[in-house]
């Protein structure tokens, strides 16, 4: 079984024998279903074709984005503070190099998701950093959240 990722928006879905028939994020009025239909990949396949690039915007604020660009080109922001680091939004690709670099900067204390287009692989990110909480705003809580460490969306999860 594979946890399929929508190639249009980057959202990961729970493991299944075959790719989902549709993507609820792409069917939302704020997104679109590609003219050619939904496309799907897996995290394992992404790791063979993509890598994460880092850009320091200012001290304590680092942008992380996948290259070549994937889905709608999301980027996450790593906010580094003396009280712990927070990842603002997620990107689909999480790999060993990214986990190693973030751990070298002090690890992660929490993840905050601002919009459904950043659900991506939030469960994978949480698990990679010890099951840290994922905070969703009330407006981002509806819809598919993919394979996550908790059973429901719309509130902080551990």
Ranges and model annotations:
Residues 18-21, 74, 123-124:
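Generic recognition of short, well-ordered alpha-helical segments
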Residues 41-42, 95, 137:
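Helix N-terminus capping/helix-initiation residues
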Residues 50-98:
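Conserved beta-strand hairpin/beta-sheet module of binuclear metal-dependent hydrolase folds
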Residues 2-60, 64-66:
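N-terminal juxtadomain amphipathic helix
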Residues 2, 19, 57, 72, ...:
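Residue-level preference for short coil/turn positions at secondary-structure junctions
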Residues 98-158:
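Active-site HxH/HxHxD metal-binding segment of metal-dependent hydrolases
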Residues 12-15, 29-33, 71, 95-96, ...:
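Active-site environment of divalent metal-dependent phosphoester hydrolases
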Residues 12-13, 76, 100-102:
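Short, flexible, glycine/charge-rich loop motifs used to bind or transfer phosphoryl groups or to couple energy/partner
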């Amino acid at each position: 079984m594979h946890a399929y990722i929508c190639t249009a928006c980057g959202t990961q879905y729970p493991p299944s024998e075959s790719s989902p028939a549709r993507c609820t994020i792409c069917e939302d009025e704020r997104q679109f279903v590609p003219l050619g239909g939904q496309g799907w990949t897996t995290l394992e396949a992404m790791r063979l074709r993509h890598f994460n690039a880092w850009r320091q915007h200012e001290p304590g604020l680092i942008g992380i984005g996948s290259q070549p660009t994937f889905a709608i080109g999301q980027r996450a922001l790593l906010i580094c503070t003396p009280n712990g680091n927070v990842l603002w939004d997620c990107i689909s690709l999480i790999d060993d190099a990214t986990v190693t670099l973030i751990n070298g900067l002090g690890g992660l204390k929490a993840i905050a998701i601002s919009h459904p287009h950043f659900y991506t692989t939030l469960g994978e990110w949480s698990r990679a950093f010890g099951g840290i909480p994922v905070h969703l705003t009330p407006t981002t809580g509806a819809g598919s959240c993919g394979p996550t460490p908790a059973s429901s969306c719309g509130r902080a999860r551990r």
